[in-house]
Amino acid sequence: MVISVEAADYTAFPCAALLVGCREDNPLEDSLLARIDQLLQGAIASLVQSREITGELNRVTILHTLGRLPAERIVLVGLGNSGALTSDRLRQVGGSAVKALKGAGVTRAASVVHRAAGVPPTSVADIAQGLSLGDYSFDIYKTKPGTTVPVTELVNLFEPGTDTADAERLLAADATICEAVSFARDLVSQPGNVATPLFLAEKALEFSARLGIACTVLDRDEMERQGMEGILSVAKGSHQLPRFIVLEYRGGSADKRPTVLVGKGITFDSGGISLKPREGMERMKDDMAGAAAVMGAVMAVAGLRLPVNVIGLIPAAENLPGGGAYKPGDIVRTMSGQTVEIVNTDAEGRMILSDALFYAQRFKPAAVIDLATLTGACLVALGSAVSGVMGNDAALVKLLRRAGEATGERLWELPLWDEYGEIMKSDVADLKNAGGPHAGTITAAWFLQRFVGKSRWAHVDIAGTAWEEKGRPYQPKGATGVGVRLLVEYLKATVR
């Protein structure tokens, strides 16, 4: 969908549908809506009176204009109470609107939602983001085309004579971010027989070449030379060879230390010898959602040309129960030199991240942030509406949580007290890779903390948020691309 702006009279603009915001509190006190009602000879007022139009958030009503306006339809989108409008609610409005447009078979539409009473001027970007993200679908493997007609164009209409340069800049930046989110969603949606470690490496090389990002891919031999046994041990059960992907975007000054982003890249997780149950195992193609988020974030940062230095590290491997697979009871010497007793081969994410976090130290980072679908315990504790965050630096965690509130990719902090470390002690190695049934999200993060050295570090557990089971206004069912917008917003905040 191409989203643009134009300074034109909405009452004279021909289109298949005109999107109009409708607040819940006294909707017809909005002069724009009142003007449209007048042109429709009181049709809206009548429906408000009968409570068929309420302005309830995300509720959509379609009215045919019957030639009274050049727009064939008025699509009224509920904004809720004007005092409760937030950026995320506006994204929801955009997502609800695009679903209604597609359902009505509209291909070309216009919008004045951003001009509704009580809506801030910059809302055009939030609404557009909801439209773009809500329009996503993954259907490349379907052999028969669907019946839904895509929305190809949406024009945001401003008052005639308005300087639209600022809005155009906002929409251009928004399009770059949404493209990166769609890229991440596509990666996570790919089946495990396609999205292998090599596939991730090839995708990284492709977009890096296009955007001028340095990309290095370490193969198994190089990983062995560097002692990355945390990653290599996990990969031993699969015929798919592991890869370690290094992305380097240098948009800041040479003396500015980089932010290192680390993404878990288990392209399929069977659990290994500690095999997962059959039910739901097909979803384990999403165990590389952290890697997808990091790749998408680096793509967006480069596309936006942010004046920051960012390193993306992606350890990529499959976790399968082959003849050479690592086993419970094995002891693995990680890249850091620390030894780990394997008590659960399904706790593989922390093993590959241990090497990546240690590798990150060579960049002398300003901060290290890892994203991972690390623990089912996080889904149990927090559900699917929020990701868990832990770290060793309160200011870093606070900035990430602020970015989460701004983007709707919210975070909830869990503690990392020393007592949790007792659970991870091993009788035969420096530590063990799983701590039993209690506090699983926290003990996993505590394990990771052992490999970050003195770096400022935060861990984001996206196990509950990487996949949407039912679908929400701007998050269709399936891969969410969570983390891309969060990381971009955080990085933008570091240069404000």
UniProtKB/Swiss-Prot annotation:
Asked if rRNA-binding is a keyword of the record, the answer is no
Q: Which InterPro entries match?
A: Leucine_aapep/pepB (IPR011356), Macro_dom-like (IPR043472), Peptidase_M17_C (IPR000819), Peptidase_M17_leu_NH2_pept (IPR023042), Peptidase_M17_N (IPR008283)
The name this protein carries in UniProt is: Probable cytosol aminopeptidase
Q: Which UniProt keywords apply?
A: Aminopeptidase, Cytoplasm, Hydrolase, Manganese, Metal-binding, Protease
Please state the protein's primary subcellular location. Answer: cytoplasm
The catalytic activity, as recorded, is: Release of an N-terminal amino acid, Xaa-|-Yaa-, in which Xaa is preferably Leu, but may be other amino acids including Pro although not Arg or Lys, and Yaa may be Pro. Amino acid amides and methyl esters are also readily hydrolyzed, but rates on arylamides are exceedingly low; Release of an N-terminal amino acid, preferentially leucine, but not glutamic or aspartic acids
Q: Which GO terms describe its molecular function?
A: aminopeptidase activity; manganese ion binding; metalloaminopeptidase activity
Q: What class of enzyme is it?
A: hydrolase
Q: Does the keyword Nucleotide-binding apply?
A: no
State the CDD domains in the record. Peptidase_M17
**EC number(s)?**
3.4.11.1, 3.4.11.10
Homology family: Belongs to the peptidase M17 family.
Can you say where in the cell this protein is located? Cytoplasm
What's this chain's function? Answer: Presumably involved in the processing and regular turnover of intracellular proteins. Catalyzes the removal of unsubstituted N-terminal amino acids from various peptides.
- One Pfam assignment: Peptidase_M17_N
Write down how the cofactor binds this protein: Binds 2 manganese ions per subunit.
Q: Which residues bind Mn(2+) 2?
A: 264, 269, 287, 348
* GO BP annotation list: proteolysis
Cofactor(s) listed in the protein's UniProt record: Mn(2+)
Indicate which residues the UniProt annotation says bind Mn(2+) 1: 269, 346, 348
